[in-house]
C-alpha cells in the first residue's frame, strides 16, 4: 500500500515539475505559504488562546481572503478560457476598491497581473 502511495506522489511531482508553467508554480507556492500561515495562526489560537480576538480574526480572515483570491487567479490561468486584459484590469479595480488595508494592495496587484494570458 505504501509503495503505491509513494509511486503516485513521485509521479505527481514529476508531472507537476515538468508540465506546469513557472507562473503557476509561483502562484502555487504563494497558496502554500498562505495555507501554512493560516494553519499556524489557527494552531496558535488553539494552543495559546484568543486574548486579542480581533487580531486573530483579522489575521485569519486575511489569510482566507488572500487564499481565495490567489486560488481564483490560479484557476483562471489553468483553465482554457481566454481572459482579456480588460477583464483582468476590471478585476484589479474591483480588488482595489474591495480591500481597504494598504498592505493588501500589492498582493492583489500581483494576482491581477498573473491573470493576463501569455508567456
Curated annotation (Swiss-Prot):
Positions of transmembrane segments: 31-51, 55-75, 82-98
Main location: endoplasmic reticulum
Ranges in the topological domain labelled Cytoplasmic: 2-30, 76-81
GO cellular component: oligosaccharyltransferase complex
UniProt keyword Membrane present: yes
Residue(s) carrying N-acetylserine: 2
Keywords for the protein's UniProt record, in alphabetical order: Acetylation, Endoplasmic reticulum, Membrane, Transmembrane, Transmembrane helix
Tree of life domain: Eukaryota
InterPro entries found in the cross-reference section: DAD/Ost2
Subunit organization: Component of the oligosaccharyltransferase (OST) complex. OST exists in two different complex forms which contain common core subunits RPN1, RPN2, OST48, OST4, DAD1 and TMEM258, either STT3A or STT3B as catalytic subunits, and form-specific accessory subunits. STT3A complex assembly occurs through the formation of 3 subcomplexes. Subcomplex 1 contains RPN1 and TMEM258, subcomplex 2 contains the STT3A-specific subunits STT3A, DC2/OSTC, and KCP2 as well as the core subunit OST4, and subcomplex 3 contains RPN2, DAD1, and OST48.
Protein name in UniProt: Dolichyl-diphosphooligosaccharide--protein glycosyltransferase subunit DAD1
Organism: Canis lupus familiaris
Lineage of origin: Eukaryota, Metazoa, Chordata, Craniata, Vertebrata
Amino acid at each position: 500500500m505504501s509503495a503505491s502511495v509513494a509511486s503516485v506522489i513521485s509521479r505527481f511531482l514529476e508531472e507537476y515539475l515538468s508540465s506546469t508553467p513557472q507562473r503557476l508554480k509561483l502562484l502555487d507556492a504563494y497558496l502554500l505559504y498562505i495555507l501554512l500561515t493560516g494553519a499556524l495562526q489557527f494552531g496558535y489560537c488553539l494552543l495559546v488562546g484568543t486574548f486579542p480576538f480581533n487580531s486573530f480574526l483579522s489575521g485569519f480572515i486575511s489569510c482566507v481572503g488572500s487564499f481565495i483570491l490567489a486560488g481564483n487567479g490560479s484557476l483562471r490561468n489553468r483553465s482554457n478560457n481566454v481572459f482579456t486584459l480588460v477583464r483582468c484590469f476590471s478585476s484589479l479595480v474591483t480588488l482595489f476598491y474591495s480591500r481597504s488595508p494598504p498592505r493588501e494592495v500589492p498582493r492583489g496587484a500581483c494576482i491581477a497581473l498573473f491573470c493576463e494570458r501569455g508567456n
